[in-house]
Amino acid sequence: MAKQLKYPFLIFIISLAQCQVSNQNVNLCQSNICQNGGTCLVASSVPATATCPKNSIYYMGSCYVFDTTLRNWNDAALYCNNMNSATLPLVESAEDQAFFAGYLQAMIPSNPPADMRPPPDGIWTAVRGVNNVTRASWVYYPGSFLVTDTFWAPQEPNIYVNYNDVCVALQSDSFYREWTTALCTILKYTVCKVAPTQIQAKYVAQCSCPNGYGGQTCETQSTTNQQASTQRTCGSNDFQFSCPNDQTITVDFASFGAQESSMCNQASQSREQTCSNVNSLQTVINACQGLQSCEIRNLTSTFSNTPCPVPQEQYLETRMRCETAQQPSCLSGLIQFDSRCYSMTIETNEKKQRTMEDAQTYCSQSGGSIITSPPDALLQQIVQKVNAETKKTVNFWIGTPNNCQLLMVTGSSTSYSQCPSSPSSTANVICSTVPQSTASVSARPTQSAPVDPVSQTMARREVYTGVQPPSVPDSINKPRYCKKEKKDGITYEQTRACMLHEQPCPDPQNVEGTVTRYCNCQTAKWETPDTTNCTHRWVAEMETAIKDNQPVEDISSTVNRQLKSTIERTLFGGDITGTVRLSNDMLSLARNQFSVLNDRNLRENKARNFTENLGGSGDQLLSPVAATVWDQLSSTIRIQHASKLMSVLEQSVLLLGDYMTDQKLNLQYINWAMEVERSEPEVQTFGAAASPNVQDDMGMMRVMAAAPPAPQPETNTTIMFPSLKLSPTITLPSASLLSSLASPTPVAGGGPSILSSFQDDTPVGMASTPNLNRNPVKLGYYAFAGFGQLLNNNNDHTLINSQVIGASIQNATQSVTLPVDHPVTFTFQHLTTKGVSNPRCVYWDLMESKWSTLGCTLIATSSNSSQCSCTHLTSFAILMDISGQVGRLSGGLASALDVVSTIGCAISIVCLALSVCVFTFFRNLQNVRNSIHRNLCLCLLIAELVFVIGMDRTGNRTGCGVVAILLHYFFLSSFCWMLLEGYQLYMMLIQVFEPNRTRIFLYYLFCYGTPAVVVAISAGIKWEDYGTDSYCWIDTSTPTIWAFVAPIIVIIAANIIFLLIALKVVLSVQSRDRTKWGRIIGWLKGSATLLCLLGITWIFGFLTAVKGGTGTAFAWIFTILNCTQGIFIFVLHVVLNEKVRASIVRWLRTGICCLPETSSAAYNSRSFLSSRQRILNMIKVNGHSYPSTASTDDKEKQLTPITKTTDWLSRLPNQDSVSIPESNFNNLNGTLENSNLNSAEIKEEDEIPELRRRVTVDLNPMIVSNNEIERMSHASSDPRGSQIIEVTAVEKKAPVKRIKFPLGAKQSERGSQHRTKAKVIAPPESPVSESGSKDYRF
């Protein structure tokens, strides 16, 4: 605490005089696992001092922060509201009174400011008054909850004219225990109730045992050789414990707390603590587990955040035992020393080191604590590890905040110094943890975290609805409402939070009653409708038939038929409760009617028909359709009626055995199965008609153990039900043993008697007195699918992870105790293998209506199954703890997905950034299509950055909502640009000429404006759906998700249409311009691939939100695809794009002189000279090189294929004319057609370069004079000295009209306008020969 108490003994006296505190521990378990009268307490896997922030104290699931600034009520409420949505405190129980009495006297300054008149006294609570006609109402804020339990001091509340100005405070005259009224404008101190530190602590169970018992669950009696010890140590003392040589400490129980109004006396009789620290067990385990001796100094300082206000009352109660020492094992990379594992951080950069408070939290997250007083041998290992990392001086925190030191490691030497006074000082940390073992906290049964009872009931509080509204600012108490909603044909009007909405049940002609639905106080969202009062009219009609004593087999048939029809239409909660009630009444009626029948065959037929119909009704109530309606019932009603239904079905099995004439009969349903066997007592063998390991004609699998040759064979029988998925198996003792233990009941009679013979401590042995009764022995088997879920308490972090199986003899409501050496054994198949742990064998206790482990033992277990043995007969199952998200992502899988997401998104972000840079900074790539690429990459880049940085920032509700909105906007914008990818492809195919003005402005307006409108509308209507407690994204359980899904569906559908049109055109047109169509096909492939990637990615993303086992596979697919979007875009549009590659190479060559030419097939042999010739030209002309790549991608450069060199020209024959054969021109014509004037090397249709040289080549032999050749060789030398012939090279401003043909033009139509010779356009200066033909310069 921040300071010592001023009046500890005065508090003690007042406590004795003024109140009686109930001995109810605030940390009691919700499900008791303790045996022999032990008390179950909740313990945390996080050690002490890690739950609350600094300068605060932990109490009942919350942290309380005291502030000395004086404020009026409104300012105090606003101050707390701004502190992570904290609230003012509330006193609603005797435990609260005891806490605040001690806490406030310790915290409120003893010397108030001298200038304050009157001096400040006490703190504000969350309660204030409201004028309500002639009386005052007292309301709790925020939420406007009506206060029902008050704790007024004597003479309170005072009378005021205007109660709107009156608030409730805790003041010193009542020792801060009772309520007093004061004007809200008076200044008082402030205490804020805030949520504890969000450390993923696991809460487990520990047992406080009565005297004489020990073990983790009080399962053993204390003996001297076990060295069992229960020890009490006052908080002002040091704790010590030691074991003999060769033995180590095992901690079974530890709780640091107090008994209010009882000062600690170490020799006094131990009683239950009225308050305790949930971190006690882990703290003591860290200090003592596995050691021969241990010591904890200054207990009050170690457990400084204990909610018990008076240190003089606090004490540590422990129960330890000494066991043979076991060699512990630590994870790889950790230092192992003296039964402890040590992990350490080594950072020389102070910014990466931790403060003392952060270091505590860091160690606590792994269940450990900061090292204290390391011995020399351990220091040597620490020094070695430090020297292996760095040669600099490294500082480590040692001890606790109240007893802190700095360990300095420099080279091979160590030294200690006092901790710096500044709370912002940083150092490295060494964490000490206990090796994992069966005694570790993680191996204990899990429990729900201890919760403030006020918070537990907050969702069901009554809201003030008086005639006059409270005068509270909206910033403190803004009313919230559940929106109008239509569900299952019922319209629920807008309802204020914390209010109950009531509606008549639908279909009033066939259904009677009302349906209610509650608007949750804390979330302002509708809860599940309660249809318990909605019942079809046939239920009442059948109740009347039972009262009229109509034939029970007819009633059961009608119920079965009506129930089936109801499930096919609409089933309500009242139908379930009514049918269970009918089933129980029909069972009693059947006993009465069948017992008076004398005709044996008639009695058997009636009993069989009744049992089949009753079983059919039970099967329908266990169906998946009915399971959703079961969930609408409250937990108490659901468990009560499910337990009754299971009991009725079990009793019906033996009822059939009473009247059957066959020795064996079974009934198989979809959701349950049963078999009943009947045998006469003189028959010593049991089930002899069955063959070993075979399935009989009635569907039962029977495995008979081999019986030795003896007059009375002792054979065990194994039963399973193949008709049920994952059916358990049950192995029973011999028939003769079961017959001797059976306690038969009369065939006729009234209701069953419920006995618990297996609770008798005296087992029935093999030498029991023989049973002389000659009545038939009835043995029933049954297995159920679905009862585990219905009988499970959803609030205790456990689940029934198997089908339910059981057996009974003579009476299903009476259990028979079996000898310890002849138990019944089971093998259960686990329904869920992910996110569960700690299997326990349990049976259903009808008297207590809960699962119990009494008499059952776990034999063996694996991830898929468990084996159990029990010493009694009833219904059994496997109970397991929920250690993760069941059936979804948990543990290592979630961590693996996080790693994959982080690495994949990092690579994707880099690829997207590179793509944006390429499409932005290369001017020759800037066109409409690449603008679409660039913006697509930019939107995905921002979206993935926001995803990585903010997806899990759920601490700040507003910030989380902003992250969700940004993700929604940029992902929608990405898909809009993806739509334009397909649209641009479509426009390229249907337009002959591209319009001169670009539509890029409209593109920007569409892709950035449309998503903004969609997001603005959805966020404005349903802002609360953006961001959840688990992730910063749209709540997938709300209709708002369709604001994202619907546009994506439309965009994907439109793009598919565009791509199909483009594919149809490409496949239907036989174009001579193959290169152009090759370019279109390439773009088509890229667009289709990208569309599939983006579309499939979010399809799997949506499926990931679907609950079930397949969600895991979808999560992996979505994670991988989402993280590789940027990589695919970079590969498709940059790496595999020839034009982009050429631009990048050309850019690189401008800065790197000797960079090799590209080896692309589109350029070699056409655009480059050989390396040898280039070197010769450099020497021959200027002695330096010029770039030889003339690409059509560059609008400023010509494209001149090189066909001749100077060396070739010099070897021509010395004659006046050269005759060129016709074949050469044929080759030349082919060269022209396949020259680099193809579409693949032209960026857009409007990027046609002008003809630099225009020549016409006739297919007749061409005569070229030597003089012209020589003149041409001098005139056409390129800068490197090579002679080139420029054939059909085009120029941007060429005075040539290119002929274009519409899509679908046939080859003949194109060919009719082609000539077998190319047009020759002579340069203006070309002379005309005498024959009328022009001279040509190549």
Curated annotation (Swiss-Prot):
InterPro entries: 7tmB2_latrophilin-like, C-type_lectin-like, C-type_lectin-like/link_sf, CTDL_fold, EGF-like_dom, GAIN_B, GAIN_dom_N, GAIN_dom_sf
Domain SUEL-type lectin: 233-322
Tissue expression as described in the entry: Pharyngeal primordium.
Transmembrane stretches, start-end: 902-922, 931-951, 960-980, 1000-1020, 1041-1061, 1086-1106, 1116-1136
Spans annotated as GPS: 841-886
Post-translational modification: Autoproteolytically processed at the GPS region of the GAIN-B domain; this cleavage modulates receptor activity.
Site entry: Cleavage: 873-874
Domain of life: Eukaryota
Protein name per the record: Latrophilin-like protein LAT-2
Ranges for domain EGF-like: 25-64, 180-219
Domain C-type lectin: 59-193
Recorded GO MF terms: carbohydrate binding; endopeptidase activity; G protein-coupled receptor activity
Summary of subunit composition and partner proteins: Heterodimer of 2 chains generated by proteolytic processing; the large extracellular N-terminal fragment and the membrane-bound C-terminal fragment predominantly remain associated and non-covalently linked.
Protein family (similarity comment): Belongs to the G-protein coupled receptor 2 family. LN-TM7 subfamily.
Region called Disordered, residue ranges: 1300-1338
One Gene Ontology CC term in the entry: plasma membrane
Gene3D superfamilies, sorted: 2.60.120.740, 2.60.220.50, GPCR, family 2, extracellular hormone receptor domain, Mannose-Binding Protein A, subunit A, Rhodopsin 7-helix transmembrane proteins
Membrane-topology descriptor: Multi-pass membrane protein
Disruption phenotype annotation: Reduced response to the inhibitory action of emodepside in pharyngeal pumping.
Subcellular localization, as worded in the UniProt entry: Cell membrane
Free-text function comment from the UniProt entry: May have a role in pharyngeal pumping during feeding.
Pfam families documented for this protein: 7tm_2, GAIN, GPS, SUEL_Lectin
Keywords assigned by UniProt, alphabetized: Cell membrane, Disulfide bond, EGF-like domain, G-protein coupled receptor, Lectin, Membrane, Receptor, Repeat, Signal, Transducer, Transmembrane, Transmembrane helix
